[in-house]
Each structure stands twice: as C-alpha cells, then as structure tokens.
Amino acid sequence: MPKIAHISDIHIRSLKRHDEYIDIFKKLSKDCADNKVDYIFLGGDIFHTKLTGISPEYIELLTWWLNDLSSIAPVHMILGNHDLNESNLSRQDAVSPIVSAMNNSNIFLYKKSGVYEFHPGWNWCIFSISDKEGWKSVKPMKNKINIACYHGPVSGARTETGYELEGEVTTSFFKDYDYAFLGDIHTFQFLGTKEIEIVVSEEELKNYSNYEIIEEVSQ
C-alpha cells in the first residue's frame, strides 16, 4: 500500500512571509522523507492572489519547493481557485508555466478531469475546476483503488468563522470512491461520517504544527 502525503492550500504570497514558508517547507520535506512517503499530492491553491501579483520571488520559491519535494517522492498536483481566473479560463494559470519550464519528470500537474493511474492498481480521479465539462467522464474503475481529487467547498462544510457553505458537491458525490483528497476549506472538520479518534501522546501533541501524519485509521 503506497504512503501518500496529502497537502493543500499553501497560498504562497507574492512577496510576504517567504522566510516563514521556507522554514515550514523544510520541516515538511523532512517529515515526508523521514516517513518515507511514496507520493506527494498537492490539492490546489498553491498561489494566493490568482493571476495578480505574480513575482520573481514567488516563481523562485515555488520552483525550489517543488524540486525539493520531487527529490523525495513524485509530486502530483491539481489547481485551486486561487491559482487561476475561473471567469476567464482562456488565461494561463499561476502554476502551469512554472511546472512546464521546470521540465521535471517527477512532477505531474493535472488540469484535465479524468482517471489517471499513478501507482499499479491506484487511480487519481480528478475533478478539475478548470475542466468541469469533463467531470461526467470521471468514474471509479472496478478492482482498483480510486481516489477522488477535488478542490472546492463541499456542502455542509464550515469556515473558520462557523459559516456553513453550500458547495457545488455534497459528500454523496464521493460515495463510490475509496478516498477523497480535498482542498479549499482550511478548517479541520468531519463531513458525513462519524468522528475518527486518533490517539497520540502528549509529547507528540507538543510537536503539532500545521499538518499531521496519520499512518492508518480503522473504523
């Protein structure tokens, strides 16, 4: 069974707080390496301000970070609403040109909706926000592990202020998939399922930062 690091909503600014990003990125890379992850999945919103304010500093930081991650494991990415202009999809997004110029064979960006095998018997089922017309062709494959990948609000999700969202999809949208890798809403919460208790020691809690690693969960 492959071990996958699921990361989303990085929101790299044009100029601000880059020192903080570098510090966290280094810690994250070390965790991925120490835990010997097989794949790294980035679930969108790499950039923060859509198509405005793209700077040389942002390009430099993203290039360094993606190269660093890809030296640990293959990196698979989708776009988020902050990475593009959803009202004008003819415009280029804030990530694709950088990935294309890097020409790194260990980095994969999925802009088209579809089913993509990334590991023997394991599929990304991509519901791309830049290719909603293609959603209808995305179906889980029999006798495979299918991971639904989507960046956007799910109905019933709540923001950090407690506001309940009416998303474009509901939890039932993912009912035929083995897993769902989601992005967009930054608040940790449970949707359409009972809460899963994860037991950790007090010492481990002291080391909690902005992400966590769950080895295995049984219900």
Which stretches of residues belong to each language-model region?
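Active-site neighborhood of phospho(di)ester-bond hydrolases with catalytic His/Asp-centered motifs
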Residues: I7-S8, Y39-D45, P74-N81, F108-S113, ...
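Core catalytic region of metal-dependent phosphoesterases/phosphodiesterases
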Residues: P2, I10, S14-G114
